[in-house]
């Protein structure tokens, strides 16, 4: 075996993972080498990247253009039996169990796929705090998957690589599938499986890079809260005075737009922890959606798409230009890039002090939630566990009906412990830091229009500069929320959602409809004492 290294690091023996006969091991290659490797003319199919006019390489991820939650399984053993939030009839989630025998079969499949090949080994960190980060070793035979890892995880220095000992190993066998999936009781021939005792993730059949990113997020969501550290699906930024704010929100709520603020430096856009020192990013890069991307609307992301960025599933014309409006492969077109492609970031390490403002973003298509409410600690837990947003979906008669989405902790797909554990840890961290929480509706109101970005930015500014704390408040029934009566730069007529309706009874009817959905959704958290105690903090129909 030859070892091609761009570091002074010690040699790696892959036989310890069951991978044998490797013809060449390429460890932590430079961006220049990755560019040359992923654009080689002899590559075929999904392995081959094309160079775009912006300088970034574009690849296709095949039939999987997003994560495949139905193919996610975790080994149920003495480590996980009593700690993991397993799927159940009452609370269905993506944490489905497999036994050790199935794991052994899948591991044999992946190691066979990677054996006798030229492989890339990428060592990186998940977590910007040295005390709690995961040292992760990724093994793949596909150059662009190594590139994705280099973009998205924190890149070790040469000195750190020389002494690198992985806490977790990810073996990506994208080219292999499992013919015995029915016998194994799995969902399909593709698989993304985890073993927390062996501290390993196996991937087969899917080429989607996000399985590696979100796989490690799910693992941080297991290890950190058990140590009393908050693990959060949120963006975070920092003001000039060092004040930190975190933004939770599901897709389409404005999380990226509102946390990208010229007055504030970005800590990170998606995954963070909160420990005794403050808020820290898990990642070394960003994974941004590119559908309908334009330089005018989102200059930061557009300008980040250059050499070393990696585009996924976009349409590249024959002249190398990109059609960002084309969603024919998927609406989930993406780009990964190292975080330093964004100018206004916290340097040199993506971390800040303790958060003083915690913002939950919901796009309420029912049109009844206030544009901003200040939450009590109990309400913070309730709305964090609810993780509400809603979209407008057309029906066959052309009427637009709101479709609610409730996703625990604004990231249910990535939770590995019971949701109440994340809520408890978050509120403890908030109380210790004296942080305030706010529920911000970036959706609709009684006018039938979406709340303007100008008003929403005015609300966020009022939260961040503290002026909302000086405002008089009033009580909104049914949802049991306190709202300000006036804020600088915000239309006062929208702050009480009832004022946006010609007929206040229409608001009441819609509000009761949404409140009922909140109550029904929250029922699944009443299987423990913590959840039962929070029911009183939610909406009330009497």
Curated annotation (Swiss-Prot):
Coiled coil: none annotated. GO terms for cellular component: cytosol. The keyword Cytoplasm applies. Its EC number is 4.1.1.49. Binds 1 Mn(2+) ion per subunit. Mn(2+) binds at residues 214, 233, 270. ATP binds at residues 214, 233, 249-257, 298, 334, 450-451, 456. InterPro entries: PEP_carboxykinase_ATP, PEP_carboxykinase_C, PEP_carboxykinase_N, PEPCK_ATP_CS. Its cofactor is Mn(2+). It is found in: Cytoplasm. One of its GO terms (biological process) is gluconeogenesis. Monomer. Involved in the gluconeogenesis. Catalyzes the conversion of oxaloacetate (OAA) to phosphoenolpyruvate (PEP) through direct phosphoryl transfer between the nucleoside triphosphate and OAA. Belongs to the phosphoenolpyruvate carboxykinase (ATP) family. This is Phosphoenolpyruvate carboxykinase (ATP). It comes from Vibrio cholerae serotype O1 (strain ATCC 39315 / El Tor Inaba N16961).
